[in-house]
């Protein structure tokens, strides 16, 4: 990959995972600048089928693909092999679709120390009926599908009781896609004795310009960097 580091010192590393748009965009660029300027290696990636990644036919009625978890695991493994990565300080970040994929990937992989999630669905059983009610394009459950081989039992609220990683859950008070109660359900199920935080951004929504990162940049920067340097 085309990148350059100031030196060969090992640094904490953050892997950033997009939402269901799936490819590297302006959000990742802005976030990469923020964390790189504060001493982190930053890794972004395209899902297969997006950007410069391999072709992969997708049905837009599917909320996700199991291959996305395979891709995430491959990125984590590649990061672990890099000589400038502090292997004890690998964090992951994701929002929306990327949020639940990020928590599952962190849960599955011993190399990940913690994760930062924003706009996180608690489970498909919670999210799909809710999305049917609020989706601007009038989606039905027939248009909100999950692959048969996707590990549904590893969705955030279901793995939370056994989750032993650092976790920062961010949610906008006005998020109508993954409302506050979903993040509260995940947070309340987490075990005691781990570094965990639920952060509510007043006036923020789910994504786009309403994403918490855009609503309060300074708070986002302070909280997320503080979380990873705890």
Feature roles, as predicted:
Residues 104-149, 162-163:
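Hydrolase active-site cap/lid region
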Residues 20-33, 47, 181:
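The serine-hydrolase catalytic nucleophile loop
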Residues 165, 179-188:
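Short alpha-helix in the alpha/beta-hydrolase fold that links the catalytic acid
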Residues 24, 50-82:
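Catalytic nucleophile-loop/oxyanion-hole region of alpha/beta-hydrolase
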Residues 163, 169-171, 175:
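Short beta-strand/loop motif that positions the catalytic acidic residue
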Residues 10-19:
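Short beta-strand element of the alpha/beta-hydrolase
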Residues 35-55:
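Conserved alpha/beta-hydrolase
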Residues 192-230:
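C-terminal catalytic histidine-bearing segment of alpha/beta-hydrolase fold enzymes
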């Amino acid at each position: 990959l085309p990148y350059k580091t100031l030196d060969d010192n090992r640094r904490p590393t953050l892997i950033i995972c997009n939402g269901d748009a799936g490819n590297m965009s302006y959000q990742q660029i802005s976030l990469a600048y923020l964390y790189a300027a504060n001493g982190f290696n930053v890794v972004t990636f395209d899902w297969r089928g997006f950007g410069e990644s391999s072709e992969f036919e997708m049905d837009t009625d599917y909320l996700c693909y199991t291959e996305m978890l395979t891709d995430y695991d491959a990125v984590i493994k590649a990061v672990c092999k890099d000589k400038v990565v502090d292997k004890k300080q690998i964090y992951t970040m994701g929002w929306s679709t990327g949020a639940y994929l990020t928590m599952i990937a962190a849960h599955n992989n011993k190399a990940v120390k913690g994760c930062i999630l924003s706009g996180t669905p608690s489970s498909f059983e919670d999210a799909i009926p809710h999305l049917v009610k609020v989706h601007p394009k009038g989606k039905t459950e027939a248009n909100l599908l999950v692959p048969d081989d996707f590990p549904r039992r590893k969705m955030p609220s279901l793995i939370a009781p056994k989750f032993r990683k650092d976790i920062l859950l961010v949610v906008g008070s006005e998020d109508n896609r993954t409302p506050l109660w979903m993040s509260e359900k995940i947070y309340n199920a987490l075990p005691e004795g781990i570094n965990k935080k639920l952060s509510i951004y007043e006036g923020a929504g789910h994504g786009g310009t309403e994403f918490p990162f855009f609503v309060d940049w300074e708070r986002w920067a302070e909280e997320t960097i503080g979380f990873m340097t705890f």
